[in-house]
Amino acid sequence: MNPEKDFAPLTPNIVRALNDKLYEKRKVAALEIEKLVRDFVAQNNTMQIKHVIQTLSQEFALSQHPHSRKGGLIGLAACSIALGKDSGLYLKELIEPVLTCFNDADSRLRYYACEALYNIVKVARGAVLPHFNVLFDGLSKLAADPDPNVKSGSELLDRLLKDIVTESSKFDLVSFIPLLRERIYSNNQYARQFIISWILVLVSVPDINLLDYLPEILDGLFQILGDNGKEIRKMCEVVLGEFLKEIKKNPSSVKFAEMANILVIHCQTTDDLIQLTAMCWMREFIQLAGRVMLPYSSGILTAVLPCLAYDDRKKSIKEVANVCNQSLMKLVTPEDDEPDEPKSVAQKQTEPNPEDSLPKQEGTASGGPGSCDSSFGSGINVFTSANTDRAPVTLHLDGIVQVLNCHLSDTTIGMMTRIAVLKWLYHLYIKTPRKMFRHTDSLFPILLQTLSDESDEVVLKDLEVLAEIASSPAGQTDDPGAPDGPDLRVNHSELQVPTSGRANLLNPPSTKGLEGSPSTPTMNSYFYKFMINLLQTFSSERKLLEARGPFIIRQLCLLLNAENIFHSMADILLREEDLKFASTMVHTLNTILLTSTELFQLRNQLKDLQTPESQNLFCCLYRSWCHNPVTTVSLCFLTQNYRHAYDLIQKFGDLEVTVDFLTEVDKLVQLIECPIFTYLRLQLLDVKNNPYLIKALYGLLMLLPQSSAFQLLSHRLQCVPNPELLQTEDCLKAAPKSQKGDSPSIDYTELLQHFEKVQKQHLEVRHQRSGRGDHLDRRVIL
C-alpha cells in the first residue's frame, strides 16, 4: 500500500493502524473510525460516510495485503456500528467486500470476515433481508469450511440471521427458493446440515408458506435423507415429517400432482429409509389427493408392486406399499370406462402425462432397481395445481397395462407381486371392461403362460382373470377394438374359431351350473378362444396337464358355466389331430366329470337325459369321449345308457387290447365301487329292469385278467339277487315294468358307428408309430 496516498477523511494514524499485523492496533483504528463516522452521521454528511466505506472497501478489504484486508474488515464493522439504524442505507457497500473475503485462502481472514459480517447484521437486523440471498450463499459455503474456528464463527452468524428471519414478516421467499433449490443438491455433509436447518426454521415461521414451494425442494430433501450422517438423516426426517403434517392439515392447497413422480422415483431406491419415507408419503398422497393421482398410476405401480414381495426384513415397506396398492385400486371406478370425450386445447395443455418428463436436475435420484421402470417415473412433471384441479382426471390404461404385463412376464418377480398384478387385472376388467378388452389380445398369452406358475394362489387368481375375460359382456364383439396406443401390440397368432357348434356355445340354452362369473352367465367371443388356447397349452405342456389340468378345469367350472366348458372342450377335441393327446384329455375330463364335487349339478343333468339340452350335451361329449373306449363306457354308465354301454363293450373285442386299455378298465371297476355310482349299484337289485347293466358289467369282467379288479367286480356281481327270489305276490300280480329304454331322440346307431370310426383312426395311428419303431407310452395319466 502506498503510504503517500491520500485516504482522507481517514487520518494517517488510522491508516497505519489498520495495516498493522497486531489485532489490538487494528482494533484501536476501528474505534477511531467508529468515532469519525458517528460525527459524520451527526452532521448528516452522507458523502463522507460513503467515502469512508468506499475507502475501507477498495483500499483495505479488497487489498492484496492480508493485514490490510483484516483492517478493512474491522473498519467496515466499525462503520456499521457507528451508523446504527442508518446502516441499512449502506448495506450493499458494507456487505459485498466482506462476503468476498469469505473466499480468502487464509482461514484467519475468513474468521475475521465472519466476525465483521456478524456485527454488520447485528446492527442492521431486518434491513439485511433484501440481501438475504447473498448472505445465505456465503454462509452455505462457510458451513463446510475445514477450519473449526471459521465454522464456529459462521454458526454464530447463522443463528443471528435465523433469529432475524423468524421475527420478520418481510422475508422474500419467492426470490430465495431458486437458491435453495440449487444448494439443496450439495453432497457436502455440513452444507446439507446447513440447508436442512434453514428449511426447518422456515417451516416453523407462521408467515412463511414453504409448502407452496415443496415440489421444488422435495427431491433434494429425499437426496439428503440418504446421507451417511445419522444426525443429518434424523434432521431430514423431522423436516419431512413437518411438511407431511402441513399437507394433512391443509390438503386443498397442496400441489400433489407436481410431486407424484418425485415420490415414484424415491419409492424405487435401494435405501430403506428413503424408500419407506417415500412410500409413506405416497400412501398419504393417494388417500388425500384421490383421483388426482390416477394419471400417475403406471409409475406408482412400477414402484409399489415389487415391494409387495419383500420379506420380513422389509416388512414396514411392504405393509405401506400394500396400503398404497389397495388405495390406488379403489380410485378406479366404472366411470373410467366411459368413452373419452374430445379434449379442448386448454385441457390438453393442463392434463398431466406421466410418460412425459422434464430433464432431471443435477443430483436427482435414479429411477431405482426395478426391471420394469425404464419407461415410468423417470422425471418430474411441473404444472400448476389450479389447472390440474380443473382438468379432467383420466385413467391412462395403456401405461398401467404395460406395467402389469411387464411384471407378470418377469419370472423373477415374487409371488405376492404376481398375485397383486392379477388382482389389478381382474379389478380393471370389472371396473373398465370396455377399455380393457382393447388390451386382451396382448394379455392373453401371458395369462395362459401364468397357468404354469408354481403357486396355486397365483393360478387361482389367473383363472379368475381369464374367467372374467371369457364371461364379460364387453367381450361379446369379435372385434374388441384397437388398443389405446401402438405400444402394446404384441405379435400373436389370431385364433380362428370354428363356426359349427359355436352358436350354441356362445348363447347356451341353459345357464344351470353357472356359479362364479361376476358379470353374466353368458359366454362371450373370448370364451371359445380361451378354451382353444387352454387345450393348446395342455397339448404343448403335458406336465402342466398332468400336474395342474384337473385343478385348472375344476376351478373354471366354479368360475364359469361347467356345461359350456365341457361342451366346448368336447367340440374342440373332436377336431384334434393329435389323437393320443385327445385320448389323454378325454380321460382327464371324464375323471373330473365323474369325481369332482364341483360338477354335481352337471352329473345330475346327464343322469336322466330328460331335456333336449342334456341330450345335446351327451351327444357332444360322446363324440369326443370316443377317443377313449373305457371313458365312453363310463359316460354311458353315468347317463344310464346301459344298453349302449353293453353294445360298446361288445365292440371291445374288435379293439387292440393293450396294457393301458386294461389299466383303464381296472380303474373303471374301482370307480364303480365309489359313491358316485351308488345309484348304479342299487339298480343291480332290479335285475328284471336292468338286464343290460348286468350284461355290461359282466362284459367288463370278461375283459379283465384274473386281477384284484376282477375279484372286486366278481364279488359285486355275485351279490346280484336272483330275480325270482325277489318277486312278491304283489309284484307277480302287478303288470311288468318296462325297463329304462334309450332316449328315442338320440341316434345310438350313429353314435356306435362314430365310435368305430374314431377307434379305427386310433388303431391306424398306433400302427404307424409301431412301423416307425416308436414304442407306445404305457404310462397311465391320472
Curated annotation (Swiss-Prot):
Coiled-coil regions, chain positions: none
Keyword Transcription: no
Gene3D superfamilies: Leucine-rich Repeat Variant
PTM-bearing positions, type N-acetylmethionine: 1
Ranges where the record places region Mediates interaction with the PDZ domain of NOS1: 773-777
Primary residence: membrane
Phenotype on disruption: Mice die perinatally and exhibit profound degeneration in certain regions of the central and peripheral nervous systems. Selected regions in the brain are affected, especially the medulla, the pons and the midbrain and increased cell death occurs in these areas. Affected neurons contain large vacuoles.
Subcellular location: Endosome membrane; Microsome membrane
Alphabetical keyword list: Acetylation, Disease variant, Endoplasmic reticulum, Endosome, Membrane, Microsome, Neurodegeneration, Neuropathy, Phosphoprotein, Repeat
Cellular compartments per GO CC: cytosol; endoplasmic reticulum; endosome membrane; PAS complex; presynaptic endosome; vacuolar membrane
Classification via InterPro entries: ARM-like, ARM-type_fold, Vac14, VAC14_Fig4p-bd
Region (Disordered), start-end ranges: 331-371, 471-519
Phosphothreonine modifications at: 11, 499
Biased composition (Polar residues): 493-510
Residues carrying Phosphoserine: 517, 743
Recorded superkingdom: Eukaryota
HEAT repeats, residue ranges: 5-42, 89-126, 171-208, 212-249, 438-475, 560-598
PANTHER family: PROTEIN VAC14 HOMOLOG, TAX1 BINDING PROTEIN-RELATED
Disease note: Defects in Vac14 are the cause of the infantile gliosis phenotype (ingls). Mice exhibit reduced body size and diluted pigmentation that can be recognized as early as postnatal day 3 (P3). By P14, the mice exhibit a tremor and impaired motor function. Maximal survival of the mice is for 3 weeks. Small areas with the appearance of spongiform degeneration are visible in several brain regions, including the thalamus, brain stem and cerebellar nucleus.
Cited function: Scaffold protein component of the PI(3,5)P2 regulatory complex which regulates both the synthesis and turnover of phosphatidylinositol 3,5-bisphosphate (PtdIns(3,5)P2). Pentamerizes into a star-shaped structure and nucleates the assembly of the complex. The pentamer binds a single copy each of PIKFYVE and FIG4 and coordinates both PIKfyve kinase activity and FIG4 phosphatase activity, being required to maintain normal levels of phosphatidylinositol 3-phosphate (PtdIns(3)P) and phosphatidylinositol 5-phosphate (PtdIns(5)P).
Family the UniProt entry places it in: Belongs to the VAC14 family.
Assembly notes: Forms pentamers. Component of the PI(3,5)P2 regulatory complex/PAS complex, at least composed of PIKFYVE, FIG4 and VAC14. VAC14 nucleates the assembly of the complex and serves as a scaffold by pentamerizing into a star-shaped structure, which can bind a single copy each of PIKFYVE and FIG4 and coordinates their activities. Interacts with NOS1.
Listed name of the protein: Protein VAC14 homolog
Species whose genome carries this gene: Mus musculus
Gene: Vac14
